[in-house]
Amino acid sequence: MKKLLLFLLLLPTFAFAQLRDSVLIKSPIFVVMYSEVYQQPLWVQYSVLCPTGSASRAGMDFYTCDSVKTSDNADYVSNVYDKGHMAPDGDLSWDPQVEYESFLMTNMAPQAGSLNRGIWKLLETSVRGWAVQRNQ
């Protein structure tokens, strides 16, 4: 019984330890809870609007935010992982500046290429389709 009680008392310490070194980043486009320890987002919140434009992602690459410790493009030179958007640029393509902001490293998590270009892309496309169906 004492071990169970100790476990229950310590569980929140372990469960929320990752939040100690996390930063809440609010922008007009999305909100990110970013872990500087893991150098990736823990979660991202954004609104999915019906597509009203099609900004070109040509020439865009991920970039760092000076106020937060993140990985950078050099970390991915010889890496097998894709830099995957958490708030997808396809959902934020109504304006070039908005889409550019989706390329912050704080909005990126390393993903296996097959995941990023496979089921994750299908999920992003499906969410956009649902927004169009519901006219949101």
Predicted regions and their residues:
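Short, intrinsically disordered low-complexity segments
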Residues: M1-K2, S56
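Sec-dependent N-terminal signal peptides
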Residues: K3-F14
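Domain-level detector for secreted/extracellular nuclease and nuclease-toxin modules, and
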Residues: A15-Q136
